[in-house]
Regions:
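Conserved small/polar residues in nucleotide/adenosyl-binding loops
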Residues: 168-174
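Cell wall/extracellular polymer interaction/catalysis modules
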Residues: 1-150, 164-165
Length: 178
C-alpha cells in the first residue's frame, strides 16, 4: 500500500514514483512557522525495494539560517525555496567542493528573495525568480545534532543530524539520478 505522504503528494498534483527499486521520492515539508534559524521542517525519503515501500523521516531546514538572512550572499537577498516539485534537478556531487551531497545541476529551481535582513522568513510573490542557485541537499555538522541553522544554510535544504541520514539511503541510489 502506498505510504500516506505519497498520497498527499499525489493529491497536490505532483508526480509520485511508484515503479522500480530505489526510485526516490524526496519530499521536503516546510513548517508553518516563519521564524528563522530552526530545524523545524521535515524531509521524507520514500522508495520501493523488492516491492516493499521504505520510508525515512528526518528533521531538516528548508530555510536559510539567521546568518545568511542578515548577511546575504548577493545583493538581491537570501534564497528561500518556493514550494513545488523539482524533478531531475539533483545529482550526487560535492557541496562547496567539500563533502557528498545532492547538488542542483539538472534544472532550475524557483526561489523567493528575502531582502530585508530581519529574522522573519519572507515569501513575497513579487520576489520570485527561477534559476541555478546552488540550492543543494546536504548535512549540517559531521559530529552532532545542530541546534540552530546559522551558517549551515544560505538557502539549501539541510539535515539537522548527519548520523540520521545514512547517506547510503540517499546517495547510493542517486548515482543514477534523482
Amino acid at each position: 500500500m502506498i505510504p500516506n505522504i505519497l498520497k498527499e503528494v499525489a493529491d497536490r498534483g505532483y508526480v509520485v514514483f511508484t515503479k522500480g527499486d530505489y526510485n526516490l521520492n524526496i519530499i521536503g515539508v516546510r513548517s508553518k512557522s516563519i521564524e528563522s534559524n530552526k530545524f523545524d521542517d521535515t524531509m521524507y525519503i520514500v522508495f520501493k525495494q523488492n516491492d516493499t515501500w521504505i520510508q525515512f523521516k528526518f528533521p531538516i531546514t528548508t530555510d536559510p539560517g539567521l546568518y545568511y538572512l542578515n548577511n546575504p550572499m548577493g545583493v538581491n537577498g537570501t534564497a528561500i525555496v518556493c514550494e513545488g516539485q523539482y524533478r531531475g534537478i539533483y545529482k550526487l556531487g560535492l557541496h562547496r567542493g567539500s563533502y557528498e551531497a545532492l547538488v542542483q545541476t539538472g534544472g532550475k529551481i524557483k526561489i523567493y528573495r528575502d531582502r530585508n535582513k530581519d529574522e522573519i522568513l519572507d515569501h513575497e510573490p513579487t520576489s520570485l525568480i527561477d534559476g541555478y542557485f546552488g540550492i543543494n541537499i546536504h548535512r549540517a555538522s559531521t559530529r552532532t545534532n545542530s541546534n540552530n541553522v546559522d551558517k549551515w544554510s544560505a538557502g539549501c535544504q539541510v539535515f539537522q543530524n548527519a548520523y540520521a541520514v545514512s547517506y547510503t539511503h540517499l546517495t547510493l541510489p542517486t548515482k543514477r539520478i534523482v
